[in-house]
Design a protein with these regions (language model features):
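Long beta-sheet-rich domains in secretory-pathway and surface-associated proteins
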Residues: 25-230
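Secretory targeting signatures
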Residues: 1-32, 60, 170
C-alpha cells in the first residue's frame, strides 16, 4: 500500500516549522526489520533572486521491504537552508510505502552555494520496538547564482575646456550573490571619437565580490579649438 502527502500541506508546515507524523495500517510482524529510504530527485534548485520564492522540493520515499510492521523515525538537516519537515515518523505494514514531499527554503539574496541535506532514519519492529536498523539518504540543495549590477558616476556632470584631458570616475556595485566578472565599455565611444574626443578605459573588465564595489576610471581628452562645455 502506498501513501502520498500533498505539497500544499508541506508548504503550510514549512511556515509553521512542525514535524510530520504519519500512519499506514499495520499487519502482524513476521520477520526482521527491512526497509529503504530514497529521494526522487537528487538535486533541488533554489531561485533566490529578489521576488523569487527561494523554495524547492523533492519527495522522500520510505518502503517496508520486510514482513514485519515497522516504525521509522527520520530526521532531516542541511546547513544554511531550512528543511521542512525536519522530522518524519511513520508506521508501515509489510510491503507498505509512503511518499513525503520535502522542501528546502533559502532567504532571498542568499549566497550562491551547494548544501548537502542528510536524512537519518531509525527503523524498529512495531510490537516489540526491537531489531533497530539505521539507514541514511540525502540530496543536494543548490542555491542558484544570479547577477545584478549597478553603476553610478562620482560626478554626474563635469565641465572642461577644449584640448584638455580629464578622468571620469564611476562606481560599479555587484548586487548579485557571488563574485562576478564585469566587462566595461563606452556605449557611444564611436560618436565621441568621430567628434574628436579620445576615450580610454583603465581596464576592460573587473572581478567584483558579492556586495562589493569597484572604481572604474575613464580618461577623456577633448578636441582642440572647440567650445567649452560637455
Amino acid at each position: 500500500m502506498a501513501t502520498k502527502i500533498s505539497k500544499a500541506l508541506l508548504l503550510a508546515m514549512l511556515m509553521l516549522g512542525t514535524s510530520l507524523v504519519m500512519f499506514a495500517p499495520p499487519a502482524d510482524a513476521q520477520a526482521a526489520v527491512a526497509y529503504s529510504i530514497s529521494f526522487t530527485n537528487g538535486q533541488v534548485q533554489l531561485d533566490v533572486r529578489p521576488g523569487a520564492s527561494g523554495i524547492g522540493c523533492t519527495e522522500m520515499v520510505i518502503s517496508n521491504e520486510g514482513q514485519a510492521t515497522i516504525d521509522v523515525d527520520i530526521s532531516l538537516s542541511g546547513g544554511g537552508v531550512t528543511i521542512s519537515p525536519g522530522a518524519v515518523s511513520v508506521t508501515l505494514a509489510p510491503g507498505g510505502s509512503i511518499t513525503v514531499p520535502v522542501c528546502a527554503l533559502a532567504l532571498t539574496r542568499s549566497s550562491y552555494k551547494t548544501v548537502q541535506v542528510n536524512a537519518l532514519a531509525s527503523g524498529r519492529e512495531t510490537n516489540t520496538q526491537l531489531n533497530q536498523v539505521n539507514k541514511n539518504a540525502g540530496f543536494a540543495v543548490i542555491v542558484q547564482q544570479y547577477a545584478r549590477l549597478s553603476v553610478q558616476a562620482s560626478q554626474p556632470f563635469q565641465k572642461i575646456g577644449p584640448g584638455k584631458e580629464f578622468v571620469l570616475n564611476f562606481i560599479a556595485v555587484n548586487n548579485g550573490n557571488y563574485q562576478d566578472t564585469i566587462a566595461v565599455e563606452v556605449m557611444n565611444a564611436k560618436d565621441l571619437e568621430d567628434a574628436g574626443f579620445t576615450v580610454a578605459l583603465a581596464a576592460a573588465q573587473y572581478q567584483i565580490d558579492a556586495s562589493g564595489e569597484q572604481p572604474v576610471q575613464l580618461t577623456v581628452a577633448t578636441p582642440r579649438g572647440t567650445v567649452v562645455g560637455w
